[in-house]
C-alpha cells in the first residue's frame, strides 16, 4: 500500500498543475491500463491522459510504474464513474425546469443512473464544464 501512496503523491501535482478533470482522468487511466502501450507511445499516451501536464517524460515513467504494479482495469472501471452530475449540467437542467421543460433533468438523470457504463449519445455528460464558465453557486448544499 505504501508504494501506491508514494505513486499517488507524485501523480497529484501533475494533475493539479494541468488543471486536469480528475473524474475524466481516472476513467482514462482505466482505459490506459487495459490497452497495450509500447515505450514509443508512452509520452503520447501521457499527454492524452493529462493534457498540459509538466514533465511529460516523468509522467510517462509514472504510467510505466503504474502498469508494472498490475492494476485491474475492471476494478478501476467499477469505482470510477464516467458520468457525474456536473455543476454546469445541473444548472442547465434546473434553468430549463424552471421554464417548465424537464427534458434536461430526465436526460441528466438517465446519465447518472448508470454512471459507470459509457454510452453513445452521452458524451457531453462525461466532459468537464467550460473553462471560462462562471462558478456554480448552490444554496442547498448539493
Positions of predicted regions on the chain:
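Regulatory N- and C-terminal appendages and interdomain linkers associated
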Residues: 2, 6-142
Amino acid at each position: 500500500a505504501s508504494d501506491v501512496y508514494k505513486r499517488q503523491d507524485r501523480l497529484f501535482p501533475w494533475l493539479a498543475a494541468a488543471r486536469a478533470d480528475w473524474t475524466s482522468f481516472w476513467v482514462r487511466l482505466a482505459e490506459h491500463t487495459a490497452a497495450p502501450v509500447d515505450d514509443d507511445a508512452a509520452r503520447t499516451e501521457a499527454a492524452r491522459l493529462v493534457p498540459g501536464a509538466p514533465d511529460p517524460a516523468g509522467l510517462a515513467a509514472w504510467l510505466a510504474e503504474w502498469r508494472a504494479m498490475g492494476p485491474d482495469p475492471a476494478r478501476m472501471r467499477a469505482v470510477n464513474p464516467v458520468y457525474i452530475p456536473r455543476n454546469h449540467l445541473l444548472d442547465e437542467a434546473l434553468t430549463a425546469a424552471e421554464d417548465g421543460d424537464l427534458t434536461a433533468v430526465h436526460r441528466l438523470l438517465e446519465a447518472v443512473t448508470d454512471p459507470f457504463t459509457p454510452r453513445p449519445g452521452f458524451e457531453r455528460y462525461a466532459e468537464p464544464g467550460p473553462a471560462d464558465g462562471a462558478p456554480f453557486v448552490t444554496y442547498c448544499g448539493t
